């Protein structure tokens, strides 16, 4: 696993796993981490395991709707990373999944599929392909994880109204949406 780190202090209390968007790298989220200046956080920023079809950068999912999607390497990577974060001294309830675009979609699908509650999930400009599947596959424990969905109105790639619809559906199904 290729991993980058960022922290503002020597005694972080919260771990933030920063998941880049499509064609990103382990360096993509560092400017975000720096600009947020969260004194109590240590950022873990992994590189997605699949090479992007564009030839530049990396992707969390590989394949297509026709041929099927490869995600096993991604979920194995996150399982390993969560274990590393916990070995570094962070409890599950002090771990935040923060993802941008495709990384935001991953933060939701992974974070809601695990069998425990996290400190939070923050998807930014995330695209949720199958909202009903996401809702139905969530564990009872992960449904309690607070989710802060962020999406700008001027997004030319992912329509922000889809995020509003997904957030409303999730809230109606008992998720902790903010």
Describe the residue ranges of each PLM region.
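Gly/Ala-rich beta-loop-alpha elbow adjacent to hydrolase catalytic centers
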Residues: 98-103, 107
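Serine-hydrolase catalytic machinery in alpha/beta-hydrolase-like enzymes
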Residues: 1-92
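A conserved short beta-strand
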Residues: 116-128
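Short beta-strand/loop motif that positions the catalytic acidic residue
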Residues: 143, 148-151, 155
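The conserved beta1-alpha1 loop
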Residues: 17-21, 125, 151-152
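Catalytic histidine neighborhood in serine/cysteine hydrolases
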Residues: 167-178
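Acidic catalytic loop of the alpha/beta-hydrolase fold
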Residues: 130, 154-159
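Short alpha-helix in the alpha/beta-hydrolase fold that links the catalytic acid
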Residues: 29-32, 159-169
